[in-house]
Amino acid sequence: MKIGFIGLGNVGGKLAGSLIRNGYDVLVRDLDTSLEQDFVDSGASRGENPAQMTRACNLLITCLPSPAISAEVMEGKDGALGEMCAGKIWAEMSTTDDQEVRRLGQKVVDAGGEPIDCPVSGGCHRAATGNISIFAGTERSTFDKVLPVLTTIGRRVLHTGPLG
């Protein structure tokens, strides 16, 4: 599975690093492009923009600091939604709210993709060691598809029901 990872901050950087260390093919992107180089040096590729990353990947993970930034990544110029289609999964691990996740998730569904919200618990230190807890809201079939990825970055992964 090819993974796009947008948001390489305190938590996102640790999660993306776990995926790279465990052999996943990962494209990375951050508003602060200086954060990308360490991941590229570790074997990741640099993504051009959310649309290109969605086109190139099966799974797009966003781990961003606010609902507004998530909306921009998904709906803005060169946003991920423009390339979302059947066979594409969007995993939202950002700091956001349930209404915004459901709103963007419905747009993903309308485009033919599959959304999953994956809030985490455990902080940066646990994210660095793959010891966080992940609470996944989505359809069971989508959960089953991404479970191998989620168990790479988290020790406890729980399917909590539908999106949001």
Stretch-by-stretch model annotation:
Residues D41-G43, G76-K77, C85-G87, A128-N131:
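Acidic, glycine-centered active-site loop in nucleotide-sugar glycosyltransferases
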Residues L35-E36, S70, H125-T129:
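A short acidic, helix-capping loop that chelates divalent metal ions and anchors anionic groups
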Residues L8, T95-G164:
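Rossmann-fold dinucleotide-binding core
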Residues L15, L35, N49, I69, ...:
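Hydrophobic alpha-helical segments typical of transmembrane helices
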